[in-house]
Amino acid sequence: MNIIRKILFHKRINTARRISFGFALIILVGALLLMLPISSKERVVTPFLSALFTTTSATCVTGLTLINVGAYFSLFGQAVILFLIQLGGLGFMTILCIVFIVSNRQIGLRNRMLIAQTMGTESLEGIVKLAKHVLHITGIIELLGAIVLSIRFVPKYGFFKGMWFSIFHSVSAFCNAGFDIIGDGKSMLSYRHDPLVLCTLAILVAIGGLGFIVWEDIIAKKSWKRLNVYSKVIIFAQIFFIVVGTFVYFILEYGNINTIGAESVGQKILASFFQSVTTRTAGFDALIQNNLTDLSKAWGTVLMMIGGASGSTAGGVKLGTAVLVIMTLISVLRGKSDVVIHGRRVAHTTILQAMALLVLWLVLVVGGSVLISYIDNQDLINSIYEVASAYSTVGLSVGVSGSASTFTKILLIVYMFFGRVGIMTISVVFMTRIRKTNDIRYPECNFIVG
């Protein structure tokens, strides 16, 4: 324990590395717990790679699995997974604050700056207060979600099992994890015609994907007009992509007999809505993903790339990044040198960061997809869908993970880890380096592009 504390709090180890080490340690300990015979219903030792894949997916709130969680793992094993989901869903920022509070250590200026940058807030004050608020809000919303879900689960499974199912799926939805313990290996397919279950899960996913900063702003301001620019943009973008996503899925899958082609119009809208919400971050599926058209898979990959808001339980390049890239494109097409959102000019360093994150996502996803497609002889579109799902911590699968080689399983583990931890810590390092060199100004040159 002393060795761990020395590594975590060593002065020469920056916050980004502490975060990475902390997440890796949590994943490893979780894997060892899931390997124990008590974690499986058959009381057998779970293979290390399968346990590691599951705990990485849970801690990184992804949802991809090699094992049917509900059918294979015991109550103890499911509880370990739920704990990891909650821990991963709260985010490294909250975990870091909690570690400092529990260890009675003061959060220094440098750590406050890094935490604030990662959270997307401009103020260094109230970081600890915000962490406490996150815990309170999370508990209240997850409890309300569990109560609503119990209306369906308790009558069907009995009180204790029904309440456990309600709690597990409420936490899994709010943390955007997408894990289910129904046990039939079909996620929410058996509830695809149930508006109560699907809408409850979708609302939990959407709220979880807004981010802690937006929640805090809504609670503090209590008025749309008083919200800051970031909160307004994120709320609008969240609604916009859900609506557009629903419409696109409805059109692309309307005549697909293997998905919603044979359903009524109302059921088609419900399924399209749920698919739109869950594809950007959660991983629950009310449709068999492998039965989607190739165009729907391509559209789903775009939604996975966008993800949720910064400081949220969601993955992807983040909503703010997507909005900024779109606004930058519009500004360039209009011949403007500045990007203006709600009467505010966006800093050029922020635009550079957004572009870097987008390019990084594209390079890693395409590179990983080509590798998996070649090694496992998979269709490229399916490989892209699976890798995007892993790197954006979504959890939707077209079956690539289940039939994957050892190399592909390890690669997906790495992608899930860096999708949850790496893309955030890289952004922190990127911002820090820019601030260290922004006092140096070199002569400009005209560089031919396009």
Predicted regions and their residues:
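Membrane-proximal intracellular helices of multi-pass ion channels
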Residues: 1-450
